């Protein structure tokens, strides 16, 4: 997993703190205060790895990872209700956020200070959003069961409702751009095949429904090599699905706890999980074994961020 000095895991949760860990040792190297009125809903590191963005109830914060400062360096103004997701465009030029105010926002990160430059209205609280690897389309999932695909350049969008009376909890697009996944509060994960021709907006073709869990699905994510899809749940499990036929390959269990978030390593062989017992874990997927615990949070961990690179390919 890359240069060990660069292997930084970030976690946040209900104890209003964000912790930064050396992934290879389990040592906590920095603790940053979030806001006292909110848990951490999502974390993402800037592409240059120097800063960490966090979002929660009526707040978006940006922290400096290279200094000893534990306070945010930027507070984003004018955010209403719960901010549920965020992420960065690959060059770091803009950031997207999604929230329960029904909006997905594009923030210009080159401007000083950063400001909101575009808004998409989903007409319902937005639980999830992710960026297509083409860097122009954003997938979104809302509480009324809608899945949107928004082309930021052309302003075109497509809307699909895969299941009535269900809330979309997370969305993910495979790094190779072939699949879109949307997971809901009934334990189902829907897959669409994505196709794009002549630089036009991607089209969605229904692929399958995976009855993945008995309870809420909290997160779905594809592995960097696009060969695996994970789903995490309130049933205490992480299920790993092979994307060649979407059969279940592995199941990891943290009994009696919700698994709120997870992240693959760059080589797709390792997995980090965040759960309601306040522990982040590193798993070796081949053996389904938990090999390291990251302990220090006093309440549930609800978000994590990990990005490394394959060295010496």
Swiss-Prot record:
<dbReference type="GO" id="GO:0005737">
    <property type="term" value="C:cytoplasm"/>
</dbReference>
<dbReference type="GO" id="GO:0061586">
    <property type="term" value="P:positive regulation of transcription by transcription factor localization"/>
</dbReference>
<comment type="function">
    <text>Subunit of TORC1 and TORC2, which regulate cell growth and survival in response to nutrient and hormonal signals. Essential for TORC2-mediated regulation of cell growth and phosphorylation of Akt1. However it is not required for TORC1-mediated functions such as TORC1-dependent regulation of cell growth, autophagy and phosphorylation of S6K.</text>
</comment>
<dbReference type="Pfam" id="PF00400">
    <property type="entry name" value="WD40"/>
</dbReference>
<feature type="repeat" description="WD 2">
    <location>
        <begin position="35"/>
        <end position="73"/>
    </location>
</feature>
<comment type="similarity">
    <text>Belongs to the WD repeat LST8 family.</text>
</comment>
<dbReference type="GO" id="GO:0032956">
    <property type="term" value="P:regulation of actin cytoskeleton organization"/>
</dbReference>
<dbReference type="GO" id="GO:0051897">
    <property type="term" value="P:positive regulation of phosphatidylinositol 3-kinase/protein kinase B signal transduction"/>
</dbReference>
<feature type="repeat" description="WD 1">
    <location>
        <begin position="1"/>
        <end position="33"/>
    </location>
</feature>
<dbReference type="GO" id="GO:0031929">
    <property type="term" value="P:TOR signaling"/>
</dbReference>
<dbReference type="InterPro" id="IPR037588">
    <property type="entry name" value="MLST8"/>
</dbReference>
<dbReference type="Pfam" id="PF23414">
    <property type="entry name" value="Beta-prop_EML_2"/>
</dbReference>
<dbReference type="InterPro" id="IPR019775">
    <property type="entry name" value="WD40_repeat_CS"/>
</dbReference>
<protein>
    <recommendedName>
        <fullName>Protein LST8 homolog</fullName>
    </recommendedName>
</protein>
<dbReference type="InterPro" id="IPR015943">
    <property type="entry name" value="WD40/YVTN_repeat-like_dom_sf"/>
</dbReference>
<dbReference type="InterPro" id="IPR036322">
    <property type="entry name" value="WD40_repeat_dom_sf"/>
</dbReference>
<dbReference type="InterPro" id="IPR001680">
    <property type="entry name" value="WD40_rpt"/>
</dbReference>
<dbReference type="GO" id="GO:0031932">
    <property type="term" value="C:TORC2 complex"/>
</dbReference>
<dbReference type="GO" id="GO:0038203">
    <property type="term" value="P:TORC2 signaling"/>
</dbReference>
<dbReference type="GO" id="GO:0045793">
    <property type="term" value="P:positive regulation of cell size"/>
</dbReference>
<dbReference type="InterPro" id="IPR055442">
    <property type="entry name" value="Beta-prop_EML-like_2nd"/>
</dbReference>
<keyword id="KW-0677">Repeat</keyword>
<feature type="repeat" description="WD 8">
    <location>
        <begin position="296"/>
        <end position="313"/>
    </location>
</feature>
<comment type="subunit">
    <text>Part of a minimal complex, TORC1, consisting of mTor, raptor and lst8. Interacts with mTor but not raptor. Does not require raptor for binding to mTor. Part of a minimal complex, TORC2, consisting of mTor, rictor and lst8.</text>
</comment>
<keyword id="KW-0853">WD repeat</keyword>
<feature type="repeat" description="WD 5">
    <location>
        <begin position="163"/>
        <end position="202"/>
    </location>
</feature>
<dbReference type="GO" id="GO:0046628">
    <property type="term" value="P:positive regulation of insulin receptor signaling pathway"/>
</dbReference>
<dbReference type="InterPro" id="IPR020472">
    <property type="entry name" value="G-protein_beta_WD-40_rep"/>
</dbReference>
<feature type="repeat" description="WD 7">
    <location>
        <begin position="254"/>
        <end position="293"/>
    </location>
</feature>
<feature type="repeat" description="WD 3">
    <location>
        <begin position="78"/>
        <end position="117"/>
    </location>
</feature>
<feature type="repeat" description="WD 6">
    <location>
        <begin position="212"/>
        <end position="251"/>
    </location>
</feature>
<feature type="repeat" description="WD 4">
    <location>
        <begin position="121"/>
        <end position="160"/>
    </location>
</feature>
<keyword id="KW-0963">Cytoplasm</keyword>
<dbReference type="GO" id="GO:0034504">
    <property type="term" value="P:protein localization to nucleus"/>
</dbReference>
């Amino acid at each position: 997993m890359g240069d060990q000095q660069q292997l930084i895991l970030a976690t946040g949760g209900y104890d209003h703190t964000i912790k930064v860990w050396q992934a290879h040792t389990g040592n906590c190297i920095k603790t940053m205060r979030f806001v006292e009125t909110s848990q951490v809903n999502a974390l993402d590191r800037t592409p240059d790895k120097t800063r960490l963005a966090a979002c929660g109830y009526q707040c978006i914060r940006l922290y400096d990872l290279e200094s000893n400062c534990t306070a945010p360096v930027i507070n984003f103004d004018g955010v209403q209700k719960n901010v549920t997701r965020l992420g960065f465009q690959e060059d770091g030029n803009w950031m997207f956020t999604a929230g329960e105010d029904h909006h997905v926002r594009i923030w210009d990160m080159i401007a000083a200070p950063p400001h909101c430059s575009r808004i998409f209205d989903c007409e319902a609280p937005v639980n999830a959003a992710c960026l297509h690897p083409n860097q122009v389309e954003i997938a979104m999932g809302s509480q009324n069961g809608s899945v949107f695909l928004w082309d930021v350049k052309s302003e075109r969008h497509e809307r699909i409702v895969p299941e009535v009376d269900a809330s979309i909890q997370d969305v993910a697009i495979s790094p190779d751009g072939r699949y879109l996944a949307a997971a809901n509060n009934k334990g189902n994960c829907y897959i669409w095949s994505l196709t794009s021709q002549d630089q036009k907006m991607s089209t969605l073709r229904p692929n399958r429904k995976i009855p993945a869990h008995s309870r809420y699905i909290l997160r779905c994510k594809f592995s960097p090599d696009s060969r695996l899809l994970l789903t995490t749940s309130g049933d205490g499990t992480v299920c790993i699905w092979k994307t060649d036929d979407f059969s279940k390959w592995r199941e990891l269990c943290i009994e009696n706890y919700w698994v709120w978030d997870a992240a693959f390593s760059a080589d797709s062989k390792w997995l980090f999980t965040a759960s309601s017992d306040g522990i982040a874990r590193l798993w070796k997927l081949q053996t389904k074994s938990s090999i390291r615990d990251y302990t220090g949070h006093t309440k549930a961990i609800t978000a994590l961020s990990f990005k490394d690179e394959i060295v010496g390919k």
